[in-house]
């Protein structure tokens, strides 16, 4: 737990129940968690919060995870931050699209908390 105390994760999901579930799970593992309720919110917070990793739901109303990822990767201030798609969309074409956008990992919903934590640790260089 001590190793992860400084790992800051920004989580974006439009479902408040899933957002809280992720926040609690990651908090129990010692991560510092910030939340965003949608695509515009995550883009606005990413530059302020300076997270080590960003988790993005793909299917959010308004600015989708796809669009948010593209905008985050196009911005010099946030382009270096590893992105993880967290989505029920598991088709290979979705995973390929994520790779093309520069997304570092794709975790399927319903997610396994152990897999999610391991992915974040790996991307934050704390594996």
Task: Show the residue positions of the predicted features.
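C-terminal output helix
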Residues: 111-121
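Active-site beta3 strand of CheY-like receiver
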Residues: 49-55
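Receiver (REC) domain active-site loop signature in two-component systems and cognate sites
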Residues: 60
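Short, glycine/charged-rich "phosphate-handling" switch motifs in NTP-dependent
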Residues: 104
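Charged docking surfaces used in two-component/phosphorelay signaling
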Residues: 20-28
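Short hydrophobic/Thr-rich beta-strand motif most characteristic of the beta2 strand and flanking loop
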Residues: 30-37, 45
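Active-site residues of response regulator receiver
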Residues: 57, 87
